[in-house]
């Protein structure tokens, strides 16, 4: 394996409006379940996986991930990886509305489209970053193709199929709420929606006035008809790669993420609960999530000497990452952090980290 590159940065900052954005290459490929559009940034790096993202319902890759990947400190990461942002069918900008009666793919079928994307690009492995429905899709893909997934960052994942009580509540809500309002309730907490901040107003406007709202409803229906992933700690059905679960404190999917954490391999899984981040931490707290993503990559043997930014200014943090590179690329990690409010330390993955700075 090539020697790990050390990159030093001194401060975090949003991407300035005057900075030149990366060139994007947009591709579409036919799959057994229809066409899928994806956008590629950067060039492949030797012996490094691609970062592949999948967005949630009501969003596309830009509205879901742009605040995170355009964040100043994230540039240290993305200059070391090629990125592939997948848009669910009909969610890409300018997508035509599907004809009446169109059979939208299930979430399992959306996962089955990903091999076509990787084959088209000639990419062998990925690190997946998914939110909500996208987190489910990437998890299903990882279960079906474990050898091609090096790691997963799963934000707001709900691995369970809807039960009868969920269905009853969903149907009842549908009688009194519009599709945009139901999707907003999926994306954000009730506290956020009641506060009606600029962020909420922005995303309410995006979803309510989306020209492809009929397509969004089809994706929403597929999400609500998802199958149970049937994760089982110690069983055959589990994620084989390192996993970082992320959820905001008091977010709509907090309980589902906690339950998911209890079902995954504790030696491979870290759980990050972010305070003051609401339902979409990649939108509201890109700095904190970037820092956590750096830790995650370091634990996998990438970017082992990346310096600290926001967290280092608010607390004392130490990171020890030891990687044993063999045929199975086994890796281990230790993270300890202390602050004025107390000490949080963890050994191997399988812990819950609460970030409140």
UniProtKB/Swiss-Prot annotation:
Any one GO BP annotation for this protein: cell differentiation
One Pfam family hit: Ndr
N-acetylalanine PTM positions: 2
A GO cellular-component term linked to this record: perinuclear region of cytoplasm
Cellular location(s): Cytoplasm; Cytoplasm, Perinuclear region; Cell projection, Growth cone
Bias kind Low complexity: ranges: 333-347
Primary localization class, coarse: cytoplasm
PTM-bearing positions, type Phosphoserine: 312, 314, 318, 321, 324, 330, 336, 338-339, 341, 356
Keywords: Acetylation, Cell projection, Cytoplasm, Developmental protein, Differentiation, Neurogenesis, Phosphoprotein, Tumor suppressor, Wnt signaling pathway
Sequence positions bearing Phosphothreonine: 20, 316, 320, 334, 343
Top-level taxon in the UniProt lineage: Eukaryota
Signal peptide: none
Region (Disordered): 1-20, 320-357
Family recorded in the similarity comment: Belongs to the NDRG family.
Assembly information from the UniProt record: Interacts with CTNNB1.
Role this protein plays: Contributes to the regulation of the Wnt signaling pathway. Down-regulates CTNNB1-mediated transcriptional activation of target genes, such as CCND1, and may thereby act as tumor suppressor. May be involved in dendritic cell and neuron differentiation.
Name of the protein in question: Protein NDRG2
Organism: Macaca fascicularis
Annotated gene: NDRG2
């Amino acid at each position: 394996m090539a020697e790990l590159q050390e990159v030093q940065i001194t401060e975090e900052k949003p991407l300035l409006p005057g900075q030149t954005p990366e060139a994007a290459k947009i591709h579409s490929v036919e799959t057994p379940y229809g066409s899928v559009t994806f956008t590629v940034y950067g060039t492949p790096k030797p012996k490094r996986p691609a970062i592949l993202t999948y967005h949630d319902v009501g969003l596309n890759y830009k509205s879901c991930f742009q605040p995170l990947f355009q964040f100043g400190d994230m540039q240290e990461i993305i200059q070391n990886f090629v990125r592939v942002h997948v848009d669910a069918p009909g969610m890409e900008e300018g997508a035509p509305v599907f004809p009446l009666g169109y059979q939208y793919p299930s979430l399992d079928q959306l996962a089955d489209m990903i091999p076509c994307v990787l084959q088209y690009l000639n990419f062998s492995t990925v690190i997946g970053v998914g939110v909500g429905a996208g987190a489910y899709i990437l998890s299903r893909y990882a279960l079906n193709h474990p050898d091609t997934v090096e790691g997963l960052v799963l934000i707001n994942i709900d691995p369970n199929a809807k039960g009868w009580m969920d269905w009853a509540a969903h149907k009842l809500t549908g009688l009194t709420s519009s599709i945009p309002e139901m999707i907003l309730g999926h994306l954000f907490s009730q506290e956020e929606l009641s506060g009606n901040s600029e962020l909420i107003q922005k995303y309410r406007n995006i979803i309510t006035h989306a020209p492809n709202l009929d397509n969004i409803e089809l994706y929403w229906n597929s999400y609500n008809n998802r199958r149970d992933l049937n994760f089982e700690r110690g069983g055959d059905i589990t994620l084989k790669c390192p996993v970082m679960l992320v959820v905001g404190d008091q977010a709509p999917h907090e309980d589902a993420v906690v339950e998911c954490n209890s079902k995954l391999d504790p030696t491979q899984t870290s759980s990050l609960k972010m305070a003051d981040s609401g339902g979409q931490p990649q939108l509201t707290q890109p700095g904190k999530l970037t820092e956590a993503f750096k830790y995650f990559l370091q634990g996998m043997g990438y970017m082992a000497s990346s310096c600290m930014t926001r967290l280092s200014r608010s607390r004392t943090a130490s990171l020890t990452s030891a990687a044993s590179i063999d045929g199975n690329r086994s890796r281990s990690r230790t993270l300890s952090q202390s602050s004025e409010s107390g000490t949080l330390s963890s050994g191997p993955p399988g812990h819950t980290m609460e970030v409140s700075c």
